Amino acid sequence: KDKFDYAPQDYSDAMDSYDKVLEITGEITGEIINPNAEGVDEEGPHCADGRVEYASGTRQNLDAMVKAGLNGMTMPRRFGGLNFPITPYTMCAEIVAAADAGFGNIWSLQDCIETLYEFGNEDQHSRFIPRICAGETMSMDLTEPDAGSDLQSVMLKATFDEKENCWRLN
C-alpha cells in the first residue's frame, strides 16, 4: 500500500473497487449509451472540415465514459488509468457492448494501449497514454486487398532494413 497510491488494502477492498466500477458502467450504459444507440445508428458519423466526426450520441457516450474514469482502465494511475487488471475491464466491455455493440467497438479501442504500454518507450508512454486515457485520441485503421478489416487475413509484414535504417513493408 505504501508503494502504490490508491492500492487496495486487501482482497475485499479490491473487489469493492471493481464492483463500484461495474456499477458505474451499468449506470452509464443504462442511462446514456443504450438510450443513444438508435439515434447514433440513424445519424452516423460524418465528415466535417476533413475530419470524421462521431454522431452526437457517440460523443456523449465517450464523454460520459471518460468523465467516469473508464478510459485506460488497465493503465497505471500516473497515466490517468485505474491500474485495474484486465478482467474487470473485460466485464465492463461486455456491459458496454450489450448496450450498444457499435459503441462497444469504439470504446474498446483502448485495448490498443496495452501494446503501446508493453512495447513503447517512456517517451511514447508519456506522450500518448495520458491522451488515450483522457479520451483525446485512439483509433485502429486496417485494410488490405482481400482482407478488408479482417485482421486474421492481413498478409502485410514489416521488416527492419538495418542497412537503410528503415522499415520495409513486404
Regions found by a protein language model. Give the residues of each.
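Glycine-rich, Trp-frequent "lid" loop and neighboring beta-strands that shape
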Residues: L82, D123-N170
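N-terminal glycine-rich flavin-associated loop
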Residues: G104-E122, G148
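Amphipathic, small/basic residue-rich leader segments at the start of a protein or domain
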Residues: K1-G104, D123, R127, C166
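Short, surface-exposed, charged/polar-biased interaction segments
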Residues: E42, H46-G50, I86, I113, ...
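Small-side-chain structural scaffolding
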Residues: T25, T29, I33, A37-G39, ...
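General N-terminal targeting signals
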Residues: G50, T87-T90, L109, V154-T159
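Contiguous, well-ordered alpha-helical segments that form the cores/surfaces of helical PPI scaffolds
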Residues: D63, T90-E94, Q110-E118, M140
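Proline- and acidic/polar-enriched loop/turn elements at helix boundaries
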Residues: R77-R78, S108, E144
